[in-house]
Curated annotation (Swiss-Prot):
GO biological process: arabinan catabolic process; arabinose metabolic process; L-arabinose metabolic process; pectin catabolic process; xylan catabolic process
Underlying gene: abfB
Stored CDD domains: beta-trefoil_ABD_ABFB (cd23399)
Family: Belongs to the glycosyl hydrolase 54 family.
Binding of substrate, residues: D227, N230, G304, H424, F427, D443, H471, L476, D496
Name recorded for this polypeptide: Probable alpha-L-arabinofuranosidase B
Catalytic, as annotated region: 27-343
Residue(s) at site: Cis-peptide bond: C184, C185
Renumbered residue ranges of the record's region ABD: 344-506
Cellular location(s): Secreted
Length: 506
């Protein structure tokens, strides 16, 4: 793999002077270095984590021609150049192919290979993340995080300088505390080099979610826990630590660190306030965790054995050499707060109004008289006009509702079957009654953006943002621009996912 220049780093203390002579506040990895526990891996799609870093943050690949480009900070130590991504990806889709390591060690994260579990992509690889699934702003500047859907994962099984055996290390990640599930396992950190489960104590990674198969904290979750392999741990007990609270800050700082027979969990609101310690003590009281047998691979969004059931959103994170002090981590947290993470719009293009009734017309040349409709639970396209029957007009009419899982997006309720919504199931769109579950809410939430073919809107799945409303043989799917399903075919994709929205027929 050819990698670009620019991976040099500057080690500074409280402040760094960059080439222009401008005084720049220390980044997280500068702070860790000054504390004697330097970063050995530093990953972020949103910003530079060293004050002098000007190299690439991540790479995107576009669907139109397979070309790639690297996205760098706007300036040394700065926020990602999201405008460069937006320009490169205009009128097509983009995936995040590489998350570069800013530490200089080359510990880049790429598409995770198959392991104990296979991913959904060709040859058992995991999916890559959409480049636009997690927009944010940092100090008012737009950037994109990494939105992990089940099946998506990144990995490096040949990392350099990461902790092995019982060696000390620390790690933090900034996550979306509202995006999680109970699947295994949304992790960031140290894992097996074989992508298989090699036994207790062979991992040390941050976990976030509400899985209760192993450990848990207080309340109903989600929790920050440590994935130490064959267990998600909230403390010394293999089960519950009441001191590990449920946390759902929109921006969440999560910390795990470990050294011989001592480890800790810490957390905070990444937008304000200071860190709290949720656990600090001995290793779990089960065999295999003291001493640890860490292997030093790096994972994001998956379990050590490539378990792919989890979801979450990652903005930035690092791994260190040595066990960071609380004081060092407190300074890192202050830096994260100063970055001023904030939400950004999830939609673009023609606006929708909650409570309005709409119809959606296909724009593919074959099908411009066809509208998105349903026949029972099947969502399809049908030829509809002003002279159509009242029943057909109603089948092709939809009420716009606030997104059931995220009110920044939308859900679409059937006009003739109130209480039933368009949702995806196995990536087939269907009309289903709202059963009130978190899964239904997520599967029925969609985010319109400017139409990929320049007409109307393309309607993106909120929880699988690589996937869009697509008509294929007149049936509706949540389809990606290329993939393993027949309905993911790249031919006419932009046309098939672009819809002109109008006032409803009924």
């Amino acid at each position: 793999m050819l990698l670009p220049r620019g991976f040099n780093r500057a080690v500074v203390t409280a402040l760094g002077v960059v080439g222009t002579g401008t005084l720049v506040a220390a980044g997280p990895c500068d702070i860790y270095s000054s504390g004697g526990t330097p970063c050995v891996a530093a990953h972020s799609t949103t910003r530079a984590l060293y004050s002098a870093y000007t190299g690439p943050l991540y790479q995107v690949k576009r669907g139109s021609d397979g070309a790639t480009t690297n996205i760098a900070p706007l300036s040394a130590g700065g926020v990602a150049n999201a405008a460069a991504q937006d320009s490169f990806c205009a009128g097509t889709t983009c995936l995040i192919t590489i998350i570069y390591d800013q530490s200089g060690r080359g510990n880049h994260l790429t598409q995770a290979p198959p392991g104990g579990f296979k991913g959904p992509e060709a040859n058992g690889y995991d999916n890559l993340a959409s480049a636009i699934g997690a927009p944010v702003t940092l100090n008012g500047q737009k950037a994109y995080g990494v939105f992990i859907s089940p099946g998506t994962g990144y990995r490096n099984n040949a990392a350099s300088g990461t902790a092995t055996g019982d060696a000390p290390e620390g790690m933090y990640a900034v996550l979306d505390g509202t995006h999680y599930n109970g699947g295994c396992c949304f992790d960031y950190g140290n894992a097996e080099t074989s992508s298989t489960d090699t036994g207790n104590g062979h991992m040390e990674a941050i976990y976030f979610g509400d899985n209760t198969v192993w450990g848990s904290g207080s309340g109903s979750g989600p929790w920050i826990m440590a994935d130490l392999e064959n267990g998600l741990f909230s403390g010394s007990s293999t089960k519950n630590n009441a001191g590990d609270p449920s946390v759902s800050y929109r921006f969440l700082t999560a910390i795990v660190k470990g050294k011989p027979n001592q480890w800790a969990i810490r957390g905070a609101n990444a937008a304000s306030g200071s860190l709290s310690t949720y656990y600090n003590g001995a290793r779990p009281n089960a065999s295999g965790y003291n001493p640890m047998s860490k292997e030093g691979a790096i994972i994001l969004g998956i379990g050590g054995d490539n378990s792919i059931g989890a979801q979450g959103t990652f903005y930035e994170g690092v791994m260190t050499s040595g066990y960071p002090s609380d004081a060092t981590e407190n300074s890192v947290q202050a830096n994260i707060v100063a970055a001023k993470y904030a939400v950004a719009p999830l939609t673009s293009g023609p606006s929708l109004t909650v409570g309005s009734s709409i119809s959606l017309r296909a724009t593919t040349s074959c099908c411009t008289t066809r509208y998105l409709a349903h026949n029972g639970s099947t969502v399809n396209t049908q030829v509809v006009s002003s002279s159509s029957s009242t029943a057909l007009k109603q089948q092709a009419s939809w009420t716009v509702r606030a997104g059931l899982a995220n009110s920044a997006c939308f859900s679409f309720e059937s006009k003739d079957t109130p209480g039933s919504f368009i949702r995806h199931y196995d990536f087939v769109l269907q009309l289903s009654a709202n059963d009130g579950t978190k899964q239904f809410y997520e599967d029925a939430t969609f985010c319109p953006q400017s139409g990929l073919n320049g007409q109307g809107s393309s309607i993106r799945s909120w929880n699988y943002p690589t996937r869009y409303f697509r008509h294929y043989n007149n049936v509706l799917y949540a389809a990606s621009n290329g993939g393993v399903h027949t309905f993911d075919a790249t031919g006419s994709f932009n046309d098939d996912v672009s819809w002109v929205v109008s006032t409803s027929f009924a």
